[in-house]
């Protein structure tokens, strides 16, 4: 699979296989996989990523990070020792660095019962060798990675359940991993702007969304949930509603945020809105064609993804 310089690869897990799709200027509607990666038969994939050339994929299981080729060969395997016998409560995550030389892996070792702190590791993407490691001050269930497009840093949001979330920023240097922790335990990282200059968070209590400057984290715009009143087609004067930990940057200057609520007449409803970051204005409802609040993935280029019933992505844009 040879991709143009303007393409971007994404992956979805469909029927136990990792499917790779190219986001090109010509790829719209229901996307067909350009490559399909078959994990080892004994592996249950947790998270995954694909290389831009469509020749290799990496994935995590509960006990390993693995790299495979599109022909089914295993390139390398990095085991998480000791092996965990805990089936639930921990989901190791992975992401490729922007230059695809490093695989970043979040290990929720505390919840896995390994009797050690959580850790964040960096592996050589070619051979699986450990390049850097940092213990984290978390007892997390899972972690979301976001790769900065140009400065080499990676962001990690560690979810600790009812205890909140912690956001880290890391850079792999000659001396190992340089780690910074943002000064919050109540902000959930949602998305990073296409140019890497801003990021979006939603409060762990789901009462507000905020746009922050990158890298410092200064709040540039705050959107309390009350700012969305009155809500279209909801007649209840005091509806119970909250912001979902969903949405993202639709363009460099606009984000999509998602509300969910309940009324007496409608047990549960969901609405998406586009927010203009240049003015702070909440614009009209955004129709994302998504089945539920978390089936909406803005791509930052005025397009977004949803999922078809079989698990393949559908790419949309506004007319």
Regions found by a protein language model. Give the residues of each.
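Long, positively charged binding patches that form subdomain-scale interaction surfaces
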Residues: 195-202, 207-216
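Hydrophobic beta-strand positions that form the internal "hydrophobic ladder"
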Residues: 10, 57, 103, 153-155, ...
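Recurrent small/Gly-Pro-centered beta-turn motifs in extracellular repeat architectures
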Residues: 59-61, 105-109, 156-159, 203, ...
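Short consensus segments that form the blades of beta-propeller domains
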Residues: 56-57, 110-114, 262-266
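Short loop/turn segments that connect beta-strands within the blades of beta-propeller domains
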Residues: 6, 13-16, 24, 53, ...
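Surface-exposed loop/turn elements that mediate protein-protein interactions on large endomembrane-trafficking
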Residues: 15-42, 65-87, 113-137, 161-184, ...
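Repeated scaffold domains used in trafficking and secretory/extracellular systems
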Residues: 1-8, 36-55, 82-98, 135-150, ...
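A generic, well-ordered mixed alpha/beta core segment in the N-terminal half of proteins
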Residues: 67, 76-79, 91-95, 100-104
């Amino acid at each position: 699979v040879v991709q143009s310089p303007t393409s971007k690869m994404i992956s979805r897990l469909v029927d136990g296989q990792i499917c790779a799709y190219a986001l090109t200027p010509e790829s719209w509607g229901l996307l067909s996989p350009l490559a399909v990666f078959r994990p080892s038969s004994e592996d249950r994939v947790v998270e995954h990523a694909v290389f831009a050339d469509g020749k290799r994929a990496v994935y995590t299981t509960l006990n390993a990070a693995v790299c495979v080729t599109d022909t089914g060969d295993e390139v390398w395997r990095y085991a998480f020792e000791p092996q965990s016998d805990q089936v639930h409560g921990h989901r190791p995550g992975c992401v490729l660095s922007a230059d695809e030389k490093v695989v970043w892996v979040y290990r929720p070792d505390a919840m896995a019962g390994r009797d050690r702190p959580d850790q964040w590791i960096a592996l050589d993407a070619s051979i699986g060798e450990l390049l850097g490691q940092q213990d984290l001050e978390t007892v997390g269930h899972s972690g979301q990675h976001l790769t900065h497009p140009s400065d080499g840093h990676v962001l990690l949001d560690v979810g600790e359940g009812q205890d909140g979330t912690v956001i880290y920023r890391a850079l792999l240097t000659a001396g190992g991993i340089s780690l910074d922790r943002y000064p919050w335990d109540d902000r959930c990282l949602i998305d990073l702007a296409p140019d890497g200059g801003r990021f979006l968070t939603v409060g762990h209590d789901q009462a507000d969304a905020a746009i922050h400057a990158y890298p410092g984290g200064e709040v540039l715009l705050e959107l309390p949930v009350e700012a969305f009143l009155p809500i279209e087609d909801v007649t209840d004067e005091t509806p119970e509603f909250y912001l979902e930990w969903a949405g993202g940057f639709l363009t460099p200057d606009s984000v999509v945020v998602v509300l969910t609520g309940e009324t007496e007449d409608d047990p549960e409803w969901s609405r998406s809105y586009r927010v203009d970051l240049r003015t702070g204005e909440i614009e009209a409802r955004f129709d994302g064609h998504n089945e539920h609040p978390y089936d909406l993935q803005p791509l930052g280029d005025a397009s977004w993804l949803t999922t078809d019933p079989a698990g393949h992505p559908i790419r949309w844009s506004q007319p």
